[in-house]
Amino acid sequence: MLIYSSDPSDSHVAPYGGVSALMTPNPIAAGIPAQPWPILLDASTSITTAGLCERNHREGKRLPGKWLITPAGELSDDPAVFGPPQGGTILPVGGLDHGHKGYGLSLMVEALTQGLSGFGRPEKPTTWGAAVTVQVIRPEAFLPMEEFQAQVDWLVSACLNGEKRPGIAEIVVPGQREMIRRDEALR
């Protein structure tokens, strides 16, 4: 299952190469059955979230990287430059080097959520309202479930058992740590 979400009443992310906020961080979530854990992804199409910027600003903390861009086009790790009235925006995933990829993903989310719902930024909403698209793919429509599962399980196993970079103790799949915490909490 894939879930795309956007909020057309808010803007925190500029298009790649721009400085004016147009989009939200537009999360993409996915769940894929696998062993020993399902693959669970919840990822923003921006390099960070508006919530983290706002929290760090309240707590007087800087961001871990220069993930914001000022209205003058300068990079910053200071959350005080973020949002109104300062006008700073969050960079798309990939930052300045490869932000066209996050920008493309964000455009896809905006098109699939607001485009398919027929309501979005052109209507200039003034209150929060998520536009959501849920896409469910039934693997059995393409091949027997066992074959799909064998492919995904092999991929997960190859990732978990792959050679690690120096200093890396463990390779995990998205959602693995959360599933372990859930299993521990249920004991």
Feature names for model-found ranges:
Residues 10-83:
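Phosphate/diphosphate-binding glycine-rich loops and adjacent basic-rich segments that engage nucleotide
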Residues 25, 88, 100-107, 130, ...:
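Conserved active-site and cofactor/substrate-binding residues in soluble primary-metabolism enzymes
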Residues 29-31, 40-42, 92, 134-136, ...:
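Structured core elements
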Residues 111, 122-187:
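Catalytic-core signal marking the mid-to-C-terminal active-site face
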